[in-house]
C-alpha cells in the first residue's frame, strides 16, 4: 500500500486506508478486485507521467490543454443532427447556477417547493408548446424518450411491433433497439423500418400502409425528421395508426413549434423530443435531455416511467403546493418492478428549459422559428449555387437539410 497521500484525496492517507480495510475485513486493496479474473487485471503499474508538483503547475497544465479546444463561440458552426449551438440567454445560466437549484441534495416528495414549482413550470410550459397536457420530468436524451414511449405503447396495446422511418437518426435507432430489447427477451419489441421518399425525404405512405397491421403497437414519426424534412402528412399518419389500433408517437424539435403546428393538433398520442434547444448549451456530450408528453388520461398517466410534478391546493386559502406524483409506479418507487428505468441526470436542465420558454413566450418562439426558416432556406439556396454542391430537396424543411 502506498504511503504517499494525494493532496486532493483525504482517504488516500495510509492510516485512513488501513482503517477502512480493517473495517471491511480486507487485507489489501488488491483483495477488493479478486472477483475479477486474473487474466483481466493489469499486472503492472499504469504508465503515468510524473505527478505535477503543485496546484499552480496543475493549473498551467490544464489551461494549456484547454487552449487547444475549438468551440462554436469562435467559429461559424453548422453542427446539428440533434445538438445545436442555439443562443442561450444569460438569465438561463444565472438561474440554474443559483444555490437553490444547483445542489446535489434531493428533496422529499412534498418538500423543496421552489424546485418543484420550477419543474411544474417546465411541464406546463412545454405542454402548452407541444399541445399536450401531461409532461413528465425529462429523461437522459431524445433517444431515451423515444425508447420509453415505444415501451409505453407496447404496454398500452399489448402488441410487440413498432414502425419507424428508415430515415431515422442511426444513433437514435440504436438507442430505440436497445430499449426494445433482444429477440430472446420475452418483452422484445420488433422494430420495423418504413421506407422514405427519396425525392422529398418524407415517409413513404404506401410502404407505411403495407406494414401497418394488427401487430403494430405504434408508429413513430419525427417532424422535422433526421434529414430535416417536415412530415406534411403527419395527420394522415396518425389517422392510419388509429384505424389500426396503434398509438402515434411523434418526435419533435420543440423550437420548431413557433411556426409548425403542435403534435397534439394533428392526432399525436405520445409526443417526445429533445430539450437541448431550449436554453441549454452544447457541452461535450452533455446538455442533452428528452421529454415525454401525452394527453391527461388515466391510461397514459399509469404508464409513465418518469417522475412527475403536480400542483394541489393547501390549507392556506389561495396557496398551492407542488410535489411529486405517481412516484410509486416508477423505478424510484418500485425499483426493479417499475414500469421502466430512468434517472435524474437532466432535471437541472428542466429549470433552464422553463426559464427559456418563459422568457421567449409565444411571440418569441414565432420570431425564432421564422428566423431559423429564413436562414436555413437562404443557406440552402446559397450552397446550391456553389459548383459541385447539390441540395437534393430544396424546400419543405425547417432547420436542417441534406447537401450532396
Report the location of each language-model feature.
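Conserved PLP-enzyme active-site core in the AAT-like
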Residues: 8-9, 128, 144-323, 388, ...
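A short beta-alpha structural unit
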Residues: 398-404
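Short loop-beta-helix segment that forms the pyridoxal 5′-phosphate
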Residues: 107-112, 127-148
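N-terminal entrance/gating region of PLP-dependent enzymes' catalytic architecture
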Residues: 15, 34-121, 127
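Active-site C-terminal subdomain of aminotransferase-like
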Residues: 277-398
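Short acidic-aromatic active-site loops that bind/stabilize oxyanions
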Residues: 109-119, 139-140, 224-227, 369
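Charged, compositionally biased N-terminal leader segments and the immediate start
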Residues: 1-13, 18-20, 315-318
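TRNA-binding/sensing appendages of the translation machinery
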Residues: 26-40, 268-273
